[in-house]
């Protein structure tokens, strides 16, 4: 996500539909975490998290946010600066969770992933743009699919393990941010650079493809209310869990 809701301006136009899509995903995220807290933390249905549709719901939120973040990087005047700010926000989340709930601490969560992706792609953008948008998007999606199971120690495709990676890659806890978590690594929200940066670059190329095909005009429309929510998605992300937990403590 471009979580701060900025940088959607291009040639004095704002692509409100991107705000709106991010707003819809933000509402979905809040609803998901509300359900998680009710069913899992308060024990109403501790099997809820393991239902197939729950996994689909959770993953859909992540995918949309990361794709949109890659798309919106095309409008950022200083992607490196924004990336640093998001990493600082991610670090703040880590500090708070380590203090408040050590067993549920967040190490390299989605804010850190998006922040690092912004910085990396900003540095490489001139070279990345030498690849055609369609080819870049397809290559990115292929790399995302192939490296999706990297955390499990292999490279594969749609669950098929093709190459098993050497164990030493997973013996150093400091490589977890890259996608090589050690056996004792635990994080309540974990989005390593690999494979997720490839989804980010897919979004980056997707917007270039949209612009190339003169389709950007269709993104000038808005979905009322959701476009407003989308502009404040970072603040909602940072505040929603404490608010949800506070409300549930009062009523349950």
Please annotate each region the language model reported:
Residues 1-252:
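Alpha-helical transmembrane segments and their immediate juxtamembrane cytosolic regions
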């Amino acid at each position: 996500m471009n979580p701060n809701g900025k940088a959607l301006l291009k040639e004095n136009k704002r692509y409100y539909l991107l705000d709106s899509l991010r707003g819809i995903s933000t509402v979905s995220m809040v609803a998901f975490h509300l359900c998680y807290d009710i069913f899992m933390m308060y024990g109403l249905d501790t099997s809820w998290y393991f239902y197939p549709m729950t996994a689909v719901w959770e993953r859909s939120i992540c995918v949309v946010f990361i794709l949109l973040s890659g798309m919106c990087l095309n409008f950022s005047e200083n992607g490196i600066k924004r990336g640093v700010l998001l990493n600082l926000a991610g670090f703040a989340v880590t500090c708070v969770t380590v203090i408040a709930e050590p067993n549920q601490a967040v190490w390299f969560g989605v804010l850190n992933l998006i922040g690092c992706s912004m910085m990396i792609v900003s540095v490489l953008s001139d070279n990345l743009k030498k690849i055609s948008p369609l080819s870049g998007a397809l290559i990115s999606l292929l790399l995302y699919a192939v490296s999706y199971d990297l955390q499990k120690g292999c490279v594969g495709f749609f669950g098929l393990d093709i190459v098993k990676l050497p164990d030493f890659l997973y013996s150093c806890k400091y490589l977890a941010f890259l996608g090589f978590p050690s056996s004792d690594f635990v994080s309540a929200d974990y989005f390593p650079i690999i494979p997720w940066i490839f989804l980010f670059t897919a979004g980056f190329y997707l917007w270039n493809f949209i612009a190339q095909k003169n389709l950007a005009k269709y993104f000038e429309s808005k979905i009322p209310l959701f476009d407003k929510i989308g502009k404040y998605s970072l603040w909602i992300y940072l505040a929603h869990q404490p608010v949800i937990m506070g409300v549930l403590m009062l009523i349950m």
